[in-house]
Amino acid sequence: KYNCCNITTSDGQSLSWATSIRYLGIVILNAASFCCSFKHSKAAFYRAFNAIFGKVGRVASENVIIELLSKKCLPILLYAIEVCPLSKSNISELQFAVTGAVMKIFDTKSKDIANTCAELFGVRNISSLANTRKNKFLLDLNAKESIMFKTLCSL
């Protein structure tokens, strides 16, 4: 890490350096290479899941709760995941959140049982979802014939 001096504005005020910035819902970290933090995404995912599970709880069937998880909570967790580089630890921390929700739905303490239930109910793992979203993003980006994209590709 570099220890840089603060930037001084024309009116003499000092701008300090930040370790992260939140832009369009993505937290970008101060690092040597582009990386994102998923702490806020996980918190929003847990908040959404707990709100839904608190309302329907054990009244609704597992099918309904899994469908709500897939349609309402997972998009929160996966927001802009296609543009953020994912490390193995990022994938495992996001998968842990989903597995924890499935464990709560099926009232189990076993990750293996939760993963099997998720698979049987059609909840794909984070790695697969991220790859699908990234491929779709790149195909959509490639399909658009924009000057900016052609310029970026030529660099």
Regions found by a protein language model. Give the residues of each.
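C-terminal helix/juxtamembrane-tail motif
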Residues: 140-155
